């Protein structure tokens, strides 16, 4: 078989060499490095490796997003001879392919003409040891499934560890989204796939250091608006309630609430802007399926981490919760109760230690 591997790069000098030398397969393969405008040593490093490894091609773009780089690679697959690619992968430039594991995916793909996707497990680097990502724990054995049979696939909104039939090169990433550009394309591919082969082995390891997309006010606002946009779009694509619950759980719990925790730990003072954004998100949840516990977890994040409440901001928060059927007391009672809840929480945490 013929495999095309797309790697979008931009200022990845710390990891790109490790990734490129980790890629090896008995199959005929080519690597397309699509650079979005690196200003560090990424491009010279790729050019040096081109002289050492015969499989690498480099395409340079200017001021291009990750989504644009990936779409350029997909366009290349579509425009070349159909016999040049039977399948493709997209690998994050901060990842590596674990030794001998790429051919686990290619072997599964060749095994059955109905296989349109092969999905392996992803790993993260824990003090020098590769550990299975919790979202991939449902892949317990090698088996053939569909999205309807295995809705847990919707918790894996990453290209890493996935091999696609070349026919899916017609799909596109959303270039208007900076962080969740791949959600819709992955869902479409899973929905269109005749069969999906799961491989219960760790295939790709992620060396990425989480830089957080929500470190300042502007980034946080932009990120939350993006999450709301993609959440609504994908929820409208999913037909089955179980699928919508699993996807919304991933977005609400991991993308939104984890980002909210990080942001509020950095900026604990409660502001009108923060409460308004959380309000907008909570209200958007009401128009689709969601796990109720996630709603309460979001509320706890705001109330436990938030500081410097004033009467006006609290009233906006209180009215928001009343709209979704959750009562809150008057301002003074809230402050007293919150102090007691925080004290009880700290005491419980100390006892656990």
Swiss-Prot record:
GO biological process, one term: regulation of cell shape
Enzyme Commission number(s): 2.4.-.-
Database matches in CDD domains: Glyco_tranf_GTA_type
Ranges in coiled-coil conformation: none
Pfam families documented for this protein: Glycos_transf_2
GO molecular function annotations of the record: glycosyltransferase activity
Domain of life: Bacteria
InterPro entries: Glyco_trans_2-like, Glycosyltransf_2, Nucleotide-diphossugar_trans
UniProt KW keywords: Cell shape, Cell wall biogenesis/degradation, Glycosyltransferase, Teichoic acid biosynthesis, Transferase
Keyword DNA damage listed: no
Family per similarity comment: Belongs to the glycosyltransferase 2 family.
Name the UniProt record assigns to this protein: Putative glycosyltransferase TagX
Gene name tied to this protein: tagX
């Amino acid at each position: 078989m013929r495999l095309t591997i797309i790697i979008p790069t931009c200022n990845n000098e710390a990891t790109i060499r490790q990734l490129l030398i980790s890629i090896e397969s008995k199959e005929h393969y080519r690597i397309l490095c699509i650079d979005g405008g690196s200003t560090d040593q990424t491009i010279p490093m790729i050019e040096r490796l081109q002289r050492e490894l015969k499989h690498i091609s480099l395409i340079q773009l200017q001021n291009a997003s990750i989504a644009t780089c990936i779409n350029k690679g997909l366009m290349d697959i579509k425009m070349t001879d159909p016999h040049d690619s039977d399948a493709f992968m997209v690998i994050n430039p901060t990842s590596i392919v674990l030794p001998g594991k790429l051919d686990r995916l290619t072997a599964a793909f060749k095994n059955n003409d109905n296989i349109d996707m092969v999905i392996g497990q992803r790993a993260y680097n824990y003090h020098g040891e590769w550990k299975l990502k919790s979202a991939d724990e449902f892949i317990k054995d090698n088996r053939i499934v569909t999205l309807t049979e295995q809705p847990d696939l919707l918790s894996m909104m990453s290209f890493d560890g996935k091999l696609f039939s070349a026919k899916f090169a017609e799909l596109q990433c959303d270039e208007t989204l900076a962080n969740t550009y791949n959600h819709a394309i992955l869902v479409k591919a899973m929905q269109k796939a005749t069969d999906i082969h799961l491989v219960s082995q760790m295939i790709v390891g992620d060396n990425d250091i989480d830089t957080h997309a929500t470190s300042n006010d502007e980034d946080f606002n932009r990120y939350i608006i993006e999450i709301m946009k993609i959440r609504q779009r994908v929820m409208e694509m999913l037909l089955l309630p179980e699928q919508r619950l699993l996807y919304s759980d991933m977005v609400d719990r991991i993308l939104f609430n984890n980002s909210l925790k990080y942001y509020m730990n950095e900026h604990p003072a409660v502001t009108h802007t923060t409460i308004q954004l959380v309000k907008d998100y909570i209200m958007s949840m009401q128009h689709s399926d969601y796990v109720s516990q996630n709603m309460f977890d979001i509320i706890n994040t705001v109330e436990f981490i938030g500081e410097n409440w004033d009467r006006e901001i609290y009233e906006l928060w209180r009215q928001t919760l009343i709209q979704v059927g959750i009562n809150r007391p008057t301002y003074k009672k809230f402050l007293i109760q919150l102090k007691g809840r925080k004290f009880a929480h700290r005491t419980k945490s100390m006892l656990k230690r």
